[in-house]
Amino acid sequence: MNQQHLLLDIEGTTCPVRFVSDTLFPFAKKELSRYITQNWDKRPHSKSIRAAWKEWMDDQSAESMIIKQQVTQCEIEEVEGLIQYLKHLISIDRKSTALKDLQGKIWEYGYGNGELKSQLFPETAVCLRQWHEQGLTLSVYSSGSIQAQKLLYRHSLNGNLEDLFSHWFDTHTGPKKSAESYTTIAKQLQSSPNKIWFVSDNGDECNSARLAGMHTLFSLREGNPDRDPRDHKVVHSLREVSALLIAEQ
């Protein structure tokens, strides 16, 4: 195949949006207080809690300032203030790297005790294994933390798929709607951008990837919030990705 790299989004691309919105996010929100409280005394050694605290201190939004004032006036403890702030970020769906890191640690607990099992699209496991056998380099770029990405594929209902991927990228690499992020990824893959196919359910992300020189495919699945592919090629199943790759040979 001419294109040797597949860069895959997760939510709405290899995994149904509803699994993330109806299972993963509610679990993380439910367990957030427990996790922060249990690890509060370890915060000098917890990079994720320190990062979340710094983000809160730097946030000058009205909601953030209200919670800070409650702490200053001794209405609530610092730990409760941070928990309230993080729940606020969840409620407004902010793409916070610190929050994503914490969610990954909480999901690790859920996957580890068997409460969570990843639900992928029916064809995902078969396609991933097929692409891997064909010699394609498979990589992930998701707003979820790398830890969360690996957990999702390690604990899928279709078995452990983690080893099929060679590279993992999250928002530590850069925002997904910035072309510079995709340029960085191409460099880390040691590949020309035009040798990389990026598959995502978000048209703005596809636009940014194409600006960086990548090929793009827009994943249009049931339940995906973004229904506008702009002028990107549309796939309704990962099997269609395989067909397009064959057509490019």
Swiss-Prot record:
Tell me the pathway.
Answer: Amino-acid biosynthesis; L-methionine biosynthesis via salvage pathway; L-methionine from S-methyl-5-thio-alpha-D-ribose 1-phosphate: step 3/6; Amino-acid biosynthesis; L-methionine biosynthesis via salvage pathway; L-methionine from S-methyl-5-thio-alpha-D-ribose 1-phosphate: step 4/6
Q: What reaction is this protein's catalytic activity?
A: 5-methylsulfanyl-2,3-dioxopentyl phosphate + H2O = 1,2-dihydroxy-5-(methylsulfanyl)pent-1-en-3-one + phosphate
Q: Name one GO molecular function term.
A: magnesium ion binding
Q: Broadest EC class?
A: hydrolase
- Record bears the keyword Ubl conjugation: no
Cofactor comment text: Binds 1 Mg(2+) ion per subunit.
What cofactor does this one take? Mg(2+)
Claim: Membrane is one of the keywords in the record: no
Q: Which InterPro entries match?
A: Enolase-ppase_E1, HAD-like_sf, HAD_sf
Instruction: Give the keywords, sorted.
Output: Amino-acid biosynthesis, Hydrolase, Magnesium, Metal-binding, Methionine biosynthesis
Give the GO terms filed under biological process for this record: L-methionine salvage from methylthioadenosine
Instruction: Give its E.C. classification number.
Output: 3.1.3.77
Which Pfam families has this protein been placed in? Hydrolase (PF00702)
Q: Which CDD domains match?
A: HAD_EP
Which NCBIfam families does this entry report, sorted A to Z? enolase-ppase (TIGR01691)
Its family?
Answer: Belongs to the HAD-like hydrolase superfamily. MasA/MtnC family.
Q: What is its biological role?
A: Bifunctional enzyme that catalyzes the enolization of 2,3-diketo-5-methylthiopentyl-1-phosphate (DK-MTP-1-P) into the intermediate 2-hydroxy-3-keto-5-methylthiopentenyl-1-phosphate (HK-MTPenyl-1-P), which is then dephosphorylated to form the acireductone 1,2-dihydroxy-3-keto-5-methylthiopentene (DHK-MTPene).
Subunit field text: Monomer.
This chain's protein is named Enolase-phosphatase E1
Please report the organism this UniProt entry assigns to the protein.
Answer: Synechococcus sp. (strain CC9605)
What does UniProt list as this organism's lineage? Bacteria, Bacillati, Cyanobacteriota, Cyanophyceae, Synechococcales
